[in-house]
């Protein structure tokens, strides 16, 4: 189910080649070329993350897909292996952490590494950038910001914060509201939902380190807080959400209304990607998408008439910049008059 939803949504992201021809028959083509190889980091043996990272690579027709996935008690996760086969993965290496990033970059020698991870994994990807490419974002520990008011279902707020915090100790969960009366109710609800949770200790430690409730004075302050936090996941669980959405510019993904919990996007129910910008990088980057698996090359063909008619403009600019060699190169192609 998740595979099909992710495949369908990401297939819609395909771009087209561009071709431009001017009146002198000079031609520029801008072609989309799949990367030759991609390395995918799968944290905590999560098949959902493998699907999010490998399905777009499959659609883009990347030739070689290498997955780094650590073992659990000495064994490979069958769900991850099934997802790998479904997505056409070429090879699986059994290691995790920063060392997996090193393996993908220097031993597997892939063109690009994608996939979220811990602070160590994030730093490792920054260190190997230049030798290989990485996503155009910081894909670190998970984050959620829930925007709620006095009419929002308290249990929906609490369960969303708990579900985000169970990812790990470094996960961040924030509630933003201007209604003081709901704060105590949310705190009690979180404790209630933790009673029988298997990862209770992780959630408690995560909330202690990175849990936050921000009480705002007005709507203007709410917008400022959200855009400054630039959260990975934003839940806008309000009846009057439209007045906020047009002013929110910084978020990895936005879940709108009471029936769209962040957890649904983590498992591909809608079909959008869950590898999203963290640590404020949503201010300048987007979530993982099909374009991450392509590069684009310009193919330029000038005609004799074209360079004769237009070459003088290059000469003017190159002479102005003091790059006479450029001017000579242009003149050598032009018809002498």
Annotate each PLM feature.
Residues 1-14:
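Long amphipathic alpha-helix in the N-terminal Rossmann-like dinucleotide-binding domain
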Residues 15-20, 171-176, 196-207, 237-238, ...:
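Flexible, glycine/charged-enriched surface loops at secondary-structure junctions
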Residues 18-22, 40, 67-69, 91-97, ...:
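General beta-strand structural signal in soluble alpha/beta enzymes
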Residues 88-172:
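Conserved NAD(P)+-binding/catalytic subdomain of aldehyde/semialdehyde dehydrogenases
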């Amino acid at each position: 189910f998740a595979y099909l939803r992710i495949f369908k949504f990401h297939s819609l992201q395909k771009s087209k080649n561009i071709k431009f021809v001017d009146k002198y028959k000079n031609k520029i083509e801008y072609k989309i070329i799949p990367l030759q190889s991609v390395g995918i980091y799968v944290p905590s043996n999560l098949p959902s993350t493998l699907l999010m990272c490998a399905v777009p690579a499959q659609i883009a027709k990347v030739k070689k897909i290498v997955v780094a996935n650590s073992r659990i008690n000495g064994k490979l996760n069958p769900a991850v292996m099934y997802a790998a086969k479904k997505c056409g993965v070429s090879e699986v290496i059994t290691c995790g952490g920063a060392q997996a990033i090193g393996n993908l970059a220097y031993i597997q020698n892939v063109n690009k590494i994608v996939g979220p991870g811990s602070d160590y994994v994030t730093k490792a990807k920054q260190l190997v950038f230049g030798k290989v490419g990485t996503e155009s974002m910081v894909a670190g520990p998970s984050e959620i910001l829930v925007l709620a008011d006095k009419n929002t279902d308290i249990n929906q707020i609490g369960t969303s914060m708990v579900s985000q915090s169970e990812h790990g100790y470094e996960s961040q969960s924030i509630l933003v509201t201007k209604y003081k009366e709901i704060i105590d109710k949310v705190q009690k609800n979180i404790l209630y939902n933790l009673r029988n949770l298997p990862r209770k200790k992780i959630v408690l430690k995560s909330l202690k380190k990175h849990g936050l409730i921000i009480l705002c004075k007005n709507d203007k302050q709410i917008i400022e807080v959200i855009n400054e936090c630039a959260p990975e996941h934003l839940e806008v669980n309000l009846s009057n959400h439209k007045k906020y959405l047009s002013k929110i510019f910084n978020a990895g993904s936005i879940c709108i209304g009471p029936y769209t919990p962040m957890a649904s996007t983590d498992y591909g129910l809608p079909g959008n990607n869950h590898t999203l910008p963290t640590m404020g990088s949503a201010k300048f980057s987007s979530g993982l998408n099909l374009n991450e698996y392509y590069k684009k090359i310009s193919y330029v063909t000038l005609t004799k008439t074209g360079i004769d008619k237009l070459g003088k403009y290059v000469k003017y600019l190159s002479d102005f910049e003091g790059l006479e060699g450029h001017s000579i190169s242009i003149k050598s192609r032009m018809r002498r008059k």
